[in-house]
Amino acid sequence: IMGRLRQNCGPLTPEHLLSLDFELLRAQGLSAHKAKWIRRAAERFADGEFDTGLLHRLEDEEVVEKLVTLDGVGRWTAEMITLFTLGRDDVLSFGDLGIRRGLERLYGRPLTKAEMERLRRRASPFGSAASLYLWHLASGGGVAD
């Protein structure tokens, strides 16, 4: 969907997204709810309520807390934005199915929440690297791959 948005809709800036016809957004594969949420988020960024500069200055958990105030953005989405868009080094999302599957493959069993939290502390400040490794394991990769 992101590829179609970039190819068919032009720059994905808040101002430009607000200028697009709602049905053009839908035609890129977005549900009505997602198209509406994207427009609402664009409004909040365009009117200055959301400042990308501020997001870069906040701690990781503060970024997640701020992002989940956007309609349609839950904790997992906020963590993925924190990891991939903001490029943070210490994001380990236990809400991610791939990460949980990687942990199961690594430990041979599902981990409890307490065990996952201990792992988060041990992986810090390199939680994002741990995330990439666990996704690799979940997709069938191994230590020697």
Residue locations for each model-derived region?
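Alpha-helical ds-nucleic-acid-binding substructure associated with the helix-hairpin-helix region
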Residues: 1-71, 122
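C-terminal accessory module of base-excision DNA glycosylases/AP lyases that mediates lesion recognition
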Residues: 36, 60, 75-145
